[in-house]
Amino acid sequence: MRKVTLTLSAIALALSLNGAAMAKVHMPEVVSPGVTVTELAHQQPIKWVSVAEIEKSLEGQAPMAVGFDIDDTVLFSSPGFYRGKLEYSPNDFSYLKNPEFWEKMNNEWDKFSMPKQVGIDLVQMHLKRGDTVYFITGRTQTKTETVTKYVQEGLNIPADKMQPVIFAGDQPGANNKVSWMRDHKLKIYYGDADADIAAADELNIRGIRILRAANSSYQPLPKAGQFGEEVVINSEY
Protein backbone atom coordinates (compact mmCIF):
# COMPACT_ATOMS: atom_id res chain seq x y z
CA MET A 1 0.00 0.00 0.00
CA ARG A 2 2.87 2.32 0.85
CA LYS A 3 4.41 1.73 -2.62
CA VAL A 4 1.12 2.60 -4.31
CA THR A 5 0.81 5.76 -2.24
CA LEU A 6 4.36 6.83 -3.11
CA THR A 7 3.76 6.14 -6.79
CA LEU A 8 0.56 8.17 -6.85
CA SER A 9 2.32 10.98 -4.99
CA ALA A 10 5.15 10.99 -7.56
CA ILE A 11 2.67 11.15 -10.43
CA ALA A 12 0.77 13.98 -8.80
CA LEU A 13 4.01 15.88 -8.20
CA ALA A 14 5.10 15.41 -11.82
CA LEU A 15 1.77 16.63 -13.10
CA SER A 16 1.81 19.65 -10.83
CA LEU A 17 5.35 20.54 -11.90
CA ASN A 18 4.44 20.12 -15.54
CA GLY A 19 1.40 22.33 -15.09
CA ALA A 20 3.49 24.97 -13.37
CA ALA A 21 6.05 24.84 -16.17
CA MET A 22 3.32 25.15 -18.78
CA ALA A 23 1.86 28.11 -16.96
CA LYS A 24 5.19 29.93 -17.12
CA VAL A 25 5.91 29.36 -20.83
CA HIS A 26 6.24 32.74 -22.53
CA MET A 27 4.24 33.33 -25.69
CA PRO A 28 4.75 36.44 -27.86
CA GLU A 29 1.85 38.75 -28.56
CA VAL A 30 -0.34 37.64 -31.47
CA VAL A 31 -0.09 40.37 -34.13
CA SER A 32 -1.61 38.65 -37.20
CA PRO A 33 -4.05 35.83 -38.01
CA GLY A 34 -1.20 33.59 -39.20
CA VAL A 35 -1.63 30.71 -41.63
CA THR A 36 -1.69 26.92 -41.48
CA VAL A 37 -0.03 24.53 -43.93
CA THR A 38 -3.49 23.57 -45.16
CA GLU A 39 -4.34 27.19 -45.87
CA LEU A 40 -1.05 27.67 -47.71
CA ALA A 41 -1.92 24.75 -49.95
CA HIS A 42 -5.11 26.43 -51.16
CA GLN A 43 -4.58 27.61 -54.75
CA GLN A 44 -6.39 30.18 -56.83
CA PRO A 45 -9.30 28.74 -58.86
CA ILE A 46 -7.35 28.37 -62.10
CA LYS A 47 -6.52 25.40 -64.32
CA TRP A 48 -3.43 24.02 -62.63
CA VAL A 49 -1.73 21.26 -64.60
CA SER A 50 1.40 19.17 -64.04
CA VAL A 51 3.93 17.96 -66.60
CA ALA A 52 2.65 14.42 -66.08
CA GLU A 53 -0.92 15.53 -66.75
CA ILE A 54 0.11 17.29 -69.95
CA GLU A 55 1.89 14.14 -71.08
CA LYS A 56 -1.17 12.03 -70.31
CA SER A 57 -3.42 14.41 -72.24
CA LEU A 58 -1.28 13.78 -75.34
CA GLU A 59 -1.48 9.99 -75.19
CA GLY A 60 -2.53 8.50 -78.51
CA GLN A 61 -1.71 11.67 -80.45
CA ALA A 62 0.87 11.64 -83.24
CA PRO A 63 4.14 13.55 -82.83
CA MET A 64 3.56 17.27 -83.24
CA ALA A 65 5.34 20.62 -83.33
CA VAL A 66 5.42 22.50 -80.03
CA GLY A 67 6.98 25.82 -79.12
CA PHE A 68 8.52 27.51 -76.11
CA ASP A 69 9.29 31.08 -75.20
CA ILE A 70 12.78 31.39 -73.71
CA ASP A 71 13.19 34.13 -71.09
CA ASP A 72 11.39 33.29 -67.83
CA THR A 73 9.92 30.20 -69.50
CA VAL A 74 12.83 27.80 -69.96
CA LEU A 75 15.66 30.09 -68.80
CA PHE A 76 15.93 32.36 -65.78
CA SER A 77 17.87 35.02 -67.67
CA SER A 78 17.34 38.00 -65.37
CA PRO A 79 21.07 38.30 -64.47
CA GLY A 80 21.91 39.37 -68.03
CA PHE A 81 18.97 41.75 -68.32
CA TYR A 82 19.75 43.22 -64.90
CA ARG A 83 23.36 43.79 -65.94
CA GLY A 84 22.22 45.37 -69.20
CA LYS A 85 19.93 47.82 -67.46
CA LEU A 86 22.67 48.89 -65.05
CA GLU A 87 25.20 49.31 -67.83
CA TYR A 88 23.12 50.93 -70.57
CA SER A 89 20.10 52.64 -68.98
CA PRO A 90 19.97 52.48 -65.16
CA ASN A 91 17.05 54.91 -64.96
CA ASP A 92 14.74 53.45 -67.61
CA PHE A 93 14.24 50.51 -69.96
CA SER A 94 15.73 52.04 -73.10
CA TYR A 95 18.50 49.42 -72.97
CA LEU A 96 16.01 47.03 -74.57
CA LYS A 97 16.23 49.16 -77.74
CA ASN A 98 20.03 49.32 -77.65
CA PRO A 99 21.76 47.03 -80.22
CA GLU A 100 24.88 46.91 -78.03
CA PHE A 101 22.91 45.33 -75.22
CA TRP A 102 21.46 42.67 -77.50
CA GLU A 103 24.91 41.84 -78.87
CA LYS A 104 26.05 41.21 -75.30
CA MET A 105 22.92 39.37 -74.22
CA ASN A 106 22.69 37.10 -77.25
CA ASN A 107 26.39 36.25 -77.37
CA GLU A 108 27.83 36.39 -73.87
CA TRP A 109 25.49 37.02 -70.99
CA ASP A 110 23.35 33.91 -71.32
CA LYS A 111 26.25 32.10 -69.68
CA PHE A 112 24.78 33.58 -66.47
CA SER A 113 21.27 32.30 -67.24
CA MET A 114 19.92 29.31 -65.33
CA PRO A 115 17.79 26.64 -67.01
CA LYS A 116 14.43 26.22 -65.28
CA GLN A 117 13.60 22.72 -64.11
CA VAL A 118 10.13 22.97 -65.63
CA GLY A 119 11.75 23.73 -68.99
CA ILE A 120 13.95 20.66 -68.74
CA ASP A 121 11.02 18.45 -67.73
CA LEU A 122 8.66 19.68 -70.45
CA VAL A 123 11.22 19.60 -73.26
CA GLN A 124 12.36 16.10 -72.32
CA MET A 125 8.76 14.92 -72.18
CA HIS A 126 8.07 16.24 -75.69
CA LEU A 127 11.31 14.82 -77.10
CA LYS A 128 10.42 11.42 -75.65
CA ARG A 129 7.11 11.63 -77.50
CA GLY A 130 8.92 12.37 -80.76
CA ASP A 131 7.66 15.96 -80.95
CA THR A 132 9.61 18.69 -82.76
CA VAL A 133 10.50 21.48 -80.32
CA TYR A 134 10.92 25.10 -81.40
CA PHE A 135 12.07 28.06 -79.31
CA ILE A 136 10.60 31.43 -80.27
CA THR A 137 11.89 34.46 -78.38
CA GLY A 138 10.90 38.11 -78.43
CA ARG A 139 14.57 39.10 -78.27
CA THR A 140 16.01 41.33 -80.98
CA GLN A 141 17.99 39.37 -83.55
CA THR A 142 21.75 39.89 -83.82
CA LYS A 143 24.26 38.87 -86.48
CA THR A 144 25.61 36.14 -84.24
CA GLU A 145 24.14 34.36 -81.22
CA THR A 146 24.94 31.70 -78.66
CA VAL A 147 21.40 31.45 -77.28
CA THR A 148 20.83 28.24 -79.23
CA LYS A 149 23.95 26.73 -77.67
CA TYR A 150 23.00 27.64 -74.10
CA VAL A 151 19.41 26.46 -74.52
CA GLN A 152 20.58 23.15 -75.97
CA GLU A 153 23.12 22.57 -73.21
CA GLY A 154 20.91 23.80 -70.37
CA LEU A 155 17.90 21.70 -71.38
CA ASN A 156 19.94 18.61 -72.33
CA ILE A 157 18.73 18.51 -75.93
CA PRO A 158 20.57 16.17 -78.34
CA ALA A 159 22.26 18.08 -81.17
CA ASP A 160 20.16 16.38 -83.84
CA LYS A 161 16.95 17.42 -82.06
CA MET A 162 17.86 21.08 -81.51
CA GLN A 163 16.26 23.67 -83.78
CA PRO A 164 17.97 27.08 -84.11
CA VAL A 165 16.34 29.68 -81.85
CA ILE A 166 13.87 31.91 -83.68
CA PHE A 167 14.24 35.63 -82.91
CA ALA A 168 10.79 37.13 -83.46
CA GLY A 169 11.74 40.57 -82.13
CA ASP A 170 9.49 42.99 -80.32
CA GLN A 171 7.50 45.63 -82.17
CA PRO A 172 4.91 47.87 -80.47
CA GLY A 173 1.35 46.99 -81.43
CA ALA A 174 2.29 43.65 -83.01
CA ASN A 175 2.68 40.10 -81.77
CA ASN A 176 5.57 38.93 -83.91
CA LYS A 177 5.42 35.37 -82.60
CA VAL A 178 2.10 34.64 -84.32
CA SER A 179 3.50 34.29 -87.85
CA TRP A 180 6.31 32.00 -86.69
CA MET A 181 3.91 29.84 -84.71
CA ARG A 182 1.63 29.60 -87.74
CA ASP A 183 4.46 28.83 -90.18
CA HIS A 184 5.74 25.98 -88.00
CA LYS A 185 2.22 24.62 -87.43
CA LEU A 186 2.56 24.53 -83.66
CA LYS A 187 -0.04 22.66 -81.64
CA ILE A 188 1.12 23.83 -78.20
CA TYR A 189 2.98 26.94 -77.08
CA TYR A 190 4.43 27.52 -73.62
CA GLY A 191 5.17 30.98 -72.27
CA ASP A 192 5.18 33.18 -69.19
CA ALA A 193 3.87 36.40 -70.74
CA ASP A 194 0.34 37.47 -71.62
CA ALA A 195 1.54 37.95 -75.22
CA ASP A 196 2.50 34.26 -75.40
CA ILE A 197 -0.98 33.14 -74.39
CA ALA A 198 -2.56 35.74 -76.67
CA ALA A 199 -0.56 34.48 -79.66
CA ALA A 200 -1.69 30.91 -79.01
CA ASP A 201 -5.28 32.05 -78.62
CA GLU A 202 -5.16 33.98 -81.90
CA LEU A 203 -4.16 30.79 -83.70
CA ASN A 204 -6.59 28.65 -81.69
CA ILE A 205 -3.82 26.39 -80.40
CA ARG A 206 -3.15 25.20 -76.86
CA GLY A 207 -1.41 27.93 -74.88
CA ILE A 208 0.05 26.83 -71.56
CA ARG A 209 1.30 29.34 -69.00
CA ILE A 210 4.64 29.00 -67.23
CA LEU A 211 4.99 30.94 -63.97
CA ARG A 212 7.50 33.79 -64.02
CA ALA A 213 9.83 33.77 -61.01
CA ALA A 214 9.00 36.44 -58.43
CA ASN A 215 12.55 37.83 -58.60
CA SER A 216 12.54 38.17 -62.37
CA SER A 217 13.76 41.49 -63.75
CA TYR A 218 10.64 41.50 -65.94
CA GLN A 219 8.06 43.26 -63.77
CA PRO A 220 5.19 43.50 -63.01
CA LEU A 221 4.36 39.82 -62.79
CA PRO A 222 1.52 38.71 -65.07
CA LYS A 223 -1.77 37.30 -63.79
CA ALA A 224 -1.39 33.63 -64.65
CA GLY A 225 -4.65 31.93 -65.57
CA GLN A 226 -6.59 35.12 -66.21
CA PHE A 227 -7.48 34.05 -69.77
CA GLY A 228 -8.62 30.59 -68.69
CA GLU A 229 -5.39 28.99 -69.89
CA GLU A 230 -3.73 26.04 -68.19
CA VAL A 231 -0.95 26.96 -65.76
CA VAL A 232 1.89 24.56 -64.98
CA ILE A 233 2.16 24.07 -61.23
CA ASN A 234 5.55 24.73 -59.59
CA SER A 235 6.83 26.24 -62.85
CA GLU A 236 8.40 29.33 -61.30
CA TYR A 237 11.73 27.50 -61.14
Curated annotation (Swiss-Prot):
Main EC class the enzyme belongs to: hydrolase
Taxonomic placement: Bacteria, Pseudomonadati, Pseudomonadota, Gammaproteobacteria, Enterobacterales
Cofactor details (free text): Binds 1 Mg(2+) ion per subunit.
Pfam families listed in its UniProt record: Acid_phosphat_B
Catalysed reactions listed for this entry: a phosphate monoester + H2O = an alcohol + phosphate
UniProt-listed Enzyme Commission number(s): 3.1.3.2
InterPro entries in alphabetical order: Acid_phosphat_B-like, HAD-like_sf, HAD-SF_ppase_IIIB_AphA, HAD_sf
Signal peptide extent: 1-23
Primary localization: periplasm
Coiled-coil segments: none
Entry keywords, A to Z: Hydrolase, Magnesium, Metal-binding, Periplasm, Signal
Cofactor(s) required for function per UniProt: Mg(2+)
Protein name: Class B acid phosphatase
Organism: Proteus mirabilis (strain HI4320)
A Gene Ontology term for the protein's cellular component: outer membrane-bounded periplasmic space
Residues the record marks as active site: 69, 71
